[in-house]
Amino acid sequence: MARHTAKSHKIRKVEILVIQMKIYATILDNNVKYNYRKAVTQYMNRFELVVPCHFGLEAVVKREIYDLGYEITRVEDGRVSFEGDAEAICRANIFLRGAERVLLQVGRFKAATFDELFENVKALPWENYIPKDGRFWVKKASSIKSKLFSPSDIQSIVKKAMVERMKRSYHIDWFPEDGAQYPVRVFLYKDEVMVTLDTSGDSLHKRGYRLATSKAPLTETLAASLIMLTPWHADRILVDPFCGSGTFPIEAAMMAANIAPGMNREFTAESWTNIIPRK
């Protein structure tokens, strides 16, 4: 009887151990699934961001992006690209002094005909960026050394392709376009097409502090970039005897006071709640 009781006790302990192992395995599996979903979400929410700047000043903007903690993915004439998340969109618009604007790259491909342009734009996942009530239009198209050279035709084809893609994705034939604005900018260079969403809206040289401008003013982004190329520091005096509207002194004063250039203005992407979540 005692031997039977001891045996039953051992069996019970084994059963409990098996149950504990199953529970542990379930928890581990759920953690793995959670971490996987988290990793996928973080990956899916990362974007290729393109920062246009003045020609010859790419190194200045590149250093600014590095200082914000992001890795550069590409440097071209008048453009610097880096990878970032929704927070990077906000930080770049607010803190970059030499950038003209911040663009979110939707796609990049080769196109030598309008059919190729249409099909490639249509293949882009626009539903991941623009909601069904979003107001979208091609704000600007530029073409350099490309077979497709008419900006107005490029704008028209890209808009049509976007509509066709979104009609299929949202299963609707008409878009109210009464929601947030999603301006599109298209660039062609040697038949390579880059399609982007403009997260900035007005050019970033519009800081929001100037009520009036003088004749032939120096842009704030150019002034800030030139200052950053000099050995000037905040503890030094800056003298500009031909200051005009005072762009150099104002930009230097903002640097010395550590005032972000985009603090006093708004950005288009502020209303993109599908991309930039509200906390």
Predicted regions and their residues:
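S-adenosyl-L-methionine
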Residues: V50-L57, V61, E83-F95, L188-H233, ...
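Non-catalytic nucleic-acid substrate-recognition regions in nucleic-acid-modifying enzymes
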Residues: A2, Y43-Y182
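Short, positively charged and aromatic/hydrophobic N-terminal segments
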Residues: K22-V40
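Conserved S-adenosyl-L-methionine
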Residues: L218-K279
